[in-house]
Amino acid sequence: TIELGVIDWKEIFRDACWFHWTGITPALSENAAKVCLEAIQAANEMNITVSCDINYRANLWHYGKTAAQIMTRLVEGCDVIIGNEEDCEKVFGIKPENFDAGKTNGKVNQSAFESVCHQMMNRFTRCKIMAVTLRGAINANHNTWRGILCDAGTFYHSKIYDITDVVDRVGGGDSFMGALIYGLLTYTDNKQ
């Protein structure tokens, strides 16, 4: 098992400009959560951008702590957060304002995501950018997909992609995060 103090974060991060972690890591064990916090704190001290994907998986939290107890402290050290409205509600109790999922008829409600972004950025003040992916499931083989980025209250929306012949949805969030990190490192304008 991983233990506090074993990893020399200053050496690991010596040439780094970005540290990304996912909510799956602290869900695995209390030691993994502690080492994740240790890494975040070291990255913060070294002025390295820290990002996370909340990526809540209820079935992984089995060591006696809730996601809310652990994730709040970890996310406080993040500059960039990706998470959907369901993860934000289950982990932090943040719900979209003036939103009734039963009245959407399965369609993506952009204002719900914007509400969650505002609330998350107000709660986690270090966070300067929040992003979400919006997936509309037309059926098991046909989805729509778009991304939204919130930067200091300004929202940028990708076009809506119509994805047909879906074989497996696994990895969409990971690929989005990789592209987002690349974009934020490469372009000076978040609209790009």
Please provide the spans of the model-predicted regions.
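Conserved phosphate-binding/catalytic loop of the ribokinase/pfkB sugar-kinase fold
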Residues: T1-A33
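Active-site glycine-rich loop that binds ribose-phosphate moieties when present
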Residues: I2-D8, K34-E38, K65-I70, S111-S115
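Short beta-strands and strand-loop turn motifs
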Residues: W18-T25, V50-A58, E85, A131-T133
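Short strand->helix junction
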Residues: P26-S29, A137, Y187
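Surface-exposed amphipathic alpha-helices with a cationic face
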Residues: L37-N44, M121
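Short, conserved structural micro-motifs that define repeat-unit consensus positions
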Residues: N44-V50
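Conserved phosphate/ATP/ADP-binding segment of small-molecule kinases
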Residues: M46, L60-T154
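Conserved post-catalytic alpha-helical subdomain immediately downstream of the catalytic base
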Residues: Y156-Q192
